[in-house]
Amino acid sequence: MEVPPPLVLKRPLYVPSKTLMGPGPSNCSHRVLEAMSNPVLGHMHPECLQIMDEVKEGIKYIFQTLNDATMCISGAGHSGMEAALCNLIEDGDVVLMGITGVWGHRAGDMARRYGAEVHYVEASFGRALSHEEITFAFEAHRPKVFFIAQGDSSTGIIQQNIRELGELCRKYDCFLIVDTVASLGGTEFLMDEWKVDVAYTGSQKSLGGPAGLTPISFSKRALTRIRKRKTKPKVYYFDILLIGQYWGCYGTPRIYHHTISSTLLYGLREALAHFCAVGLKAVVRRHQECSKRLQLGIEELGLEMFVSREEERLPTVNTIKVPFGVDWKKVAEYAMRKYSVEISGGLGPTVEHVFRIGLMGENATVERVDMVLSILNEAIQSSKLGIKTDLSKI
């Protein structure tokens, strides 16, 4: 039997233009998109290695770190989570997960697969974790590794006390992993000053790059622990000592580890170059100002933010309570069909409870804020009135 070529691949590729105002990815700039149209390079070509070096310096800047072990994992943000846990955890290690949404549970699932004894400290619904709650959990479990998401995109909660958690982890001889996938670029993060041992982020959110590369950095303290492991990390692909050699992190000759996408490197390089040109503080300030404008607009529309305390609201992924009697799916569908604008529903504990509006990268502008507020209001009013719109004709 011969399998014929699929008819769908005989048609030209068509990709519609959409404004991505959900929890990520965000829209790439023309600069980033144009960069990715450059010719492909071999993964060990000197020109590719040079671009990797430039990307590495950009990552150090956005994390505010001087760590040698700074690089990218080839994979989505989950690969950063896997790499952080895979390298730090050995069988029987006690690991504590901070829970403010879905990501602490996801990390716990991963850690258990690496042989860890996993415990959780969980915040009240719609709240960040207090220092007292975390300290109590440290006393109870004495963890070797503590994981926390600085910003949880499922709930729109920001954990503001990372600096204090760095001190707490040093006091208990514990290693601090911080997930900054949804927060970096939209809020302050000082890896070295706050004594964070491992940090990783996503390339496709506030950075405005393509998905598929995950910036990650390990402190000297974390690197020492990894080098003293009794066993090798359980996943070869995530072995940071090997990946770091490929990225030229340790002053040793570069080795082949895997075939990195030069195309994705070009895009991330230009996204980082934009951050450097504008300045990290200015980028953070723009994201925060846009979030405040959105929150004021939500209040004026008679809607309510999901996170009650303003200081605990994540600027990049804003969560709004779904009004009683409104079907969030119909609202999201209306926005997409009529305006090609993405407005997302909840994730994990917030499914059917919230809308999620992302203000990240190219979409963190006053114009985009005003646009999404107008569309959200129109879509909700349409839903409340029970207007049966034939969306296929919009």
UniProtKB/Swiss-Prot annotation:
Temperature behavior of the protein's activity: Optimum temperature is between 30 and 80 degrees Celsius with alanine and glyoxylate as substrates.
SUPFAM superfamilies found in the cross-reference section: PLP-dependent transferases
- Name the Pfam families on file: Aminotran_5
Q: Which reaction does it catalyse?
A: glyoxylate + L-alanine = glycine + pyruvate; (2S)-2-aminobutanoate + glyoxylate = 2-oxobutanoate + glycine; glyoxylate + L-phenylalanine = 3-phenylpyruvate + glycine; glyoxylate + L-serine = 3-hydroxypyruvate + glycine
Query: Which residues are involved in binding substrate?
Result: 153, 356
**What's this protein's name?**
Alanine--glyoxylate aminotransferase
In the record, the note on similarity to other proteins reads: Belongs to the class-V pyridoxal-phosphate-dependent aminotransferase family.
In terms of pH, how does activity behave? Answer: Optimum pH is 9 with alanine and glyoxylate as substrates.
Which keywords fit this entry according to its UniProt record? Aminotransferase, Peroxisome, Pyridoxal phosphate, Pyruvate, Transferase
Which sequence ranges form a coiled-coil region, renumbered to this chain?
A: none
What compartments host this protein? Peroxisome
Q: Which InterPro entries match?
A: Aminotrans_V_dom, Aminotrans_V_PyrdxlP_BS, PyrdxlP-dep_Trfase, PyrdxlP-dep_Trfase_major, PyrdxlP-dep_Trfase_small, SP_NH2Trfase/AEP_transaminase
List N6-(pyridoxal phosphate)lysine occurrences by residue.
Answer: 205
Please name the GO terms that the record assigns under molecular function.
Answer: alanine-glyoxylate transaminase activity; L-serine-pyruvate transaminase activity
Recorded GO cellular component terms are: peroxisome
Q: What is the lineage of its organism?
A: Eukaryota, Metazoa, Ecdysozoa, Arthropoda, Hexapoda
**What role does this protein play?**
Catalyzes the pyridoxal 5'-phosphate-dependent transamination of alanine with glyoxylate as an amino group acceptor. Can also catalyze, although with much less efficiency, the transamination of amino-butyrate, phenylalanine and serine with glyoxylate or pyruvate as an amino group acceptor. Does not catalyze the transamination of both 3-hydroxykynurenine and L-kynurenine. May play a role in the detoxification of glyoxylate, a toxic plant metabolite from the fly diet.
Q: Does the keyword Cell wall biogenesis/degradation apply?
A: no
Q: What happens when the gene is disrupted?
A: RNAi-mediated knockdown causes accumulation of calcium oxalate crystals in Malpighian tubules.
Q: Into which EC class is this enzyme placed?
A: transferase
Species per Swiss-Prot/TrEMBL record: Drosophila melanogaster (Fruit fly)
Q: What positions does the entry give for pyridoxal 5'-phosphate binding?
A: 76-78, 153, 204, 256, 259
